[in-house]
Amino acid sequence: LVGEEKLEEKYTKKVKNFQWNYFGMFAVNVALDEDVGYRADNPSVNESYNVVLGREDFEDIKREYRQMEDGMPVSPPCYTVLHPTRLDASQAPPGKHVIAIWQYAPHDLQGGAEKWDEIKEEYADECVGMLSGFAPNVKPSTILGRFVMSPRDISRTNICMIKGDTMGGRLTQDQMGILRPFPGERAYRTPIEGLYLCGPSTHPRGGCHAANGYNCVNAMAEDLGIPKWWAK
């Protein structure tokens, strides 16, 4: 965006040393004829926005990360299901629902990242199939459509998410809080006057929706001497 020649060497070195996650996001967005009906002892599960499936204990989590480190899709899957229409019915026609399955997955598969283009629909079948085991009403007759995005797809469509990394970089001690994205730099500001950062690589991280942008706007207001009317 700027050009390395316009930045000091100490800054470009920090950029090059920034660490990205080795895994990204695999997403299956599904349109349904009815809401998901989970088989659960606790009825509040069918009112929840987020439901986590497949991570029954610490061994499942370790298996998940081992498989990703080996360049393999997680199988059996361990993922989060989001239910947006439970909170905002306007996201679907009356009586219909949408869900999103979010599964961590490696960008660089065994055989190369391009392999995602070959297997993503098959892996989406596995993810949806597992959901059907927990919610029998999720079946071909109730699925109106779906849209699948592999880590490779995400990296193609969002330049902030290198290798599909929705967190905007590793959440290690040296890349968190005031150290994000780089130690010793003024938060949300760059060496280029008037150029600010507000993507997932800034504090707090990706997934904290609007927080990065809100913090960035506050920094801009401070620099420009603009009253923060939104903070009143």
Predicted segments with their positions:
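Conserved FAD/dinucleotide-binding core of flavoprotein oxidoreductases
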Residues: 31-33, 93-127
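Flavin-binding catalytic cores
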Residues: 35-36, 65-74, 117-156
